[in-house]
Amino acid sequence: MAGIARLPESVANKISAGEVVQRPVSVVKELLENAIDAGADRISVIISDAGKELVRIVDNGCGMERDDALLSVERFATSKIRGVEDLEDLSSLGFRGEALASISSVSHFELRTAVEGSPLALSFRYEGGVLVEEARVQGERGTSISVRNLFYNVPARRKFLKSNATEYGHIYELVRSFVLACPEISWQMVNDGEELFNFRTPDLNERLDFFYGSGFAESLVPVTEENDYISIRGFIGRPALQKRRRLDQYFFINRRLVQNRMLSQALQQAYGELLVERQAPFALLFFEMDPSRIDVNVHPAKLEVRFEDERSVRNMFYPVIKRAVRSYDFSPDLASGELPPLSTRYPSPSPIAFQDVAEPAVTKGELYRNYREGAFSTSRPQDNLPEGFQEQLFSPPEPPAGFVGTASLAGSGGNEDEVPLGDAVAEVKIWQLHNKYLICQIKTGLMIIDQHVAHERVLYERAVDVMETSVPNSQQLLFPQKVELRPWDWEIFEEIRDDLYRLGFNLSLFGSRTVMIEGVPQDVRPGSEVSILQDMIAEYSENASKLKLEKRDNLAKSYSCRNAIMTGQKLSLQEMRSLIDSLFATRDPYCCPHGRPVIIKMTLGQLDHMFGRK
């Protein structure tokens, strides 16, 4: 066996570089943090070949004198801290003093820097961590660092880099996060010779609209909270802006971009049922707190932080988001284009094919982490709709017995000025479209309701209330129905048997794995008793395997989904009115228990625009 030997410094540097510099985006992150710490108010990011060939960061920060510049490329040399106690009061983004040493050891590295008043800039060129050239060149105050041929001397690491599209995507997403986090800084980005953006003003709305599409900033919900412990400010997105990934969730703690599972989960749970399964809301949130209450020295790439009291942070953060979510009408706006998921806009030059970027696979663990908070949560809202909501929604407060239907509408040949929209309206106009949607005339235009998901919402909240009060609302069957369950279904039945009784099912055992249905909830359609029970068990099992739902919440969702009015079912006028009245008596009429929208509204102004009247 070979004896133990100390590794040469050049080898040790390459090994340690693997912790800090994992891919081109790691280089960009470290250099951007240094530029911000240097007090720059103008930063340029220039990359070539997705960062494999070139990463150059140019800033107009304070610059460095010669001795400091040489020390900056040495391991564990930094201006940010002097002792371990400084880690408890850290205000800078960088602090370890190993980034430049790690980067220079695996690349062709050039540093140019100049301080205020210096006639010339200093230039230092390194290859594999070794200084090979020093010179004085023309240059302005600030620092420019060029990293070429990344991992040229570590072929194993270079071989495992992903496609240009993937590596470029990581870089773009990182730069975007800094651009949004630091609106006081002017940002420029150039990729393969093409300028992607150049923000010269601190207008955050301009940046949001550029990255996510025109009008995006106006659709966001502001978040503001401040106390002696923590300050929270920023924006969250409407449910219609949700994504299948969390790349558009930005958490900045004391200006540091971090990843934190607790914050992501609390954000997800605050939205509750407004989110479709496995979707994540947009968030751009800034936290300010005493640096001594957080530990940033957790992850080599400084991507994670540890809170001194994580529970207190969550208990402050969750209600803030919950209040913001509840304070807005989240029914989708048809003309705003909210219904389709809003795709992130990646300006890209022709050589890079973004269609090659695959969505990250969703693991079972992520599904459990991303579960939506159900109605049985102790923190769920108990408030009803705002006072006077229905009076504002429908033109007349009470519909009369007579109803003018589609025939009358089709037969009216008057112009728009003859359409009564004020006090002259004598009834609520309701039509069923293709036995699928309900169309209602409202003061501002029209409202479209999905009859299936609307009934789901009604049944879900009824089930929740019934099981919480333990007062079953059951109707007895004249002829009991017999159901034989498969072994795996029987196990589910045994698990939810007591809650089925609370829901209104009166069940008795009849031999091995056989159940007699003697009574059902009053909402169950006659003749569907057996299929409803079987479908509920199947739905409950599927939800349990995919999502982390509380047992009663899962049962209520399964019951409402399987028992709701189906698409294609014709409704009478009275049934439509009853459904709408029941919907707006629920706590949350805007989405079904699974997160799909229930209501879409169109204003007269939007219709006028579509018909060229405006």
UniProtKB/Swiss-Prot annotation:
It comes from the Bacteria. PROSITE patterns: DNA_MISMATCH_REPAIR_1. One of its GO terms (molecular function) is mismatched DNA binding. One of its GO terms (biological process) is mismatch repair. GO terms for cellular component: mismatch repair complex. Pfam families: DNA_mis_repair, HATPase_c_3, MutL_C. Keywords: DNA damage, DNA repair. HAMAP family: DNA_mis_repair. Belongs to the DNA mismatch repair MutL/HexB family. This protein is involved in the repair of mismatches in DNA. It is required for dam-dependent methyl-directed DNA mismatch repair. May act as a 'molecular matchmaker', a protein that promotes the formation of a stable complex between two or more DNA-binding proteins in an ATP-dependent manner without itself being part of a final effector complex. PANTHER family: DNA MISMATCH REPAIR PROTEIN MLH, PMS, MUTL (PTHR10073), DNA MISMATCH REPAIR PROTEIN MLH1 (PTHR10073:SF12). This is DNA mismatch repair protein MutL. It comes from Chlorobium phaeovibrioides (strain DSM 265 / 1930). The gene is mutL.
